[in-house]
Amino acid sequence: MNDTTQPTKGDAVKKILALILGLCLIVPVISIAGCVGGGNSQPSNNEKPSTIIIRTTGATFPKYQIQKWIEDYQKTHPNVKIEYEGGGSGYGQEAFAKGLTDIGRTDPPVKESMWKKFLSTGDQPLQFPEIVGAVVVTYNIPEIGDKTLKLSRDVLADIFLGKIEYWDDERIKKINPEIADKLPHEKIIVVHRSDASGTTAIFTTYLSLISKEWAEKVGAGKTVNWPTDNIGRGVAGKGNPGVVAIVKSTPYTVAYTELSYAIEQKLPVAALENKNGKFVKPTDETIKAAVSAVKASIPNPTEGYKEDLKQMLDAPGDNAYPIVAFTHLLVWENKNGKHYSPEKAKAIKDFLTWVLTEGQKPEHLAPGYVGLPEDVAKIGLNAVNMIKE
C-alpha cells in the first residue's frame, strides 16, 4: 500500500491564491483593488476630463467668424467641443425655441412675438450682438472681370424690382463710364435666398429705406416675394453658400450676400451709393465708419425688440458703407437648470466671455468682419453673467 498522500482540493485552492498574490506583488501596475476584488477603481489624476459639447445653430451671416472663433478657442480649451450648424436665422430661432440647440444665432434681433414663444418655456431668453458684418452686392459679368461695378440707390432697387432688365441699360452705363462699353446686352439674373434668412432681412430692410416702391410693393423680412421670380429672372439658393455658388457658376447673375462669402469665393463686390451720395466699397475702414456714425440703441438682453432694428443701415458719412449690421446671439438664463447642466452652463459662459473680449481682437477676426464697439460688447458680457450654473 502506497504511503504518499494525494493533494486535496483545499491545497489546490491555496496554491492558486498564492499565485495570484505573487502576481500582485510582482506586477505593480495591477491595482490592489483589482487583485482583491470589490468596488470600482477610481479614475487616476492623469485621465482627461470629459468633453463638453456646445451646439450652436442659425445664421450663416457670421459663419466664417464663428468657425474662426471655434478654431481659436478650442486650441486652448481642448475639453470643449463646439458644433456649428447653419440653416439661417429663422431656423436658428426655431431650434432655440424647441431646445434643439444651446446657442441660437440670428442676424435680425428677435421681435416680441417670437420672444413670447421663448418665455413660454419657463426660462428667460437673452439676446445681444456678437459681431459686425456687411451685406454686399456681388455679380458675375465675364466681360468686365473683377472691375468694380457702381450701383446708385435707385438703380440697385430697380434691378431687384426687375425694372432694369439688361446689364447694358443706359442707367447702369451712365454711372459706370469706365466700363460702359464692356457691359453686355444680357439679361440680369437675380439670385436670392430660398430659406428664412437674416441676410435677406438686412438687405430688404435697406432696400425699403432707399426705395419707396420697394417698401410698398415688397417690404422687408427674412423671406419676401421676389419680383424677379414672377418674370422668370429670379433664382434661389439655400444659405449664403448656396447663393454665392450660383453666382460663381452662372454668368450675368447678381446677388446679395455677407462680405466674408464674397471674399472667400473671390467674387467682385459693387461700390454702393451711400447716404452722402458717395460710391463706397465694403472694407474694414468703411464698415467702421458706419459703426461710428450711428449710436445704436440696443434693448436690455432680457427684452424682445419692438421692431427689426435698423441699427447701422444707411449710416451718414462720406466713407460709410451703407449696409452694415450686427448679428445676434441667443442663450438661456437657465433658471433652475432648465436648459443647461452646471458644467455646460459654465462652459457656455466661458466661451461667450472669450468671444466678447479676446474674440473681438483683430487676431481673432475673420476677413469681412469688424469687432463690436466696447459699449455694445459690455451689453453682451452683462447678459452672459446672468446665465445660471
Swiss-Prot record:
Classification via CDD domains: PBP2_PstS
Segments passing through the bilayer: 16-36
InterPro entries per record: ABC_phos-bd_PstS, PBP_domain, Phosphate-bind_PstS
Top-level taxon of origin: Archaea
Intracellular or extracellular location(s): Cell membrane
Cited SUPFAM superfamilies: Periplasmic binding protein-like II
Sorted UniProt keywords: Cell membrane, Membrane, Phosphate transport, Transmembrane, Transmembrane helix, Transport
GO molecular function: phosphate ion binding
BP GO annotations: phosphate ion transmembrane transport
UniProt: phosphate binding residues: 59-61, 89, 107, 197-199
GO-annotated cellular components: ATP-binding cassette (ABC) transporter complex
Topology of the protein relative to the lipid bilayer: Single-pass membrane protein
Function description: Part of the ABC transporter complex PstSACB involved in phosphate import.
NCBIfam families: 3a0107s03
Family: Belongs to the PstS family.
Subunit composition and interactions: The complex is composed of two ATP-binding proteins (PstB), two transmembrane proteins (PstC and PstA) and a solute-binding protein (PstS).
Name of this chain's protein: Phosphate-binding protein PstS
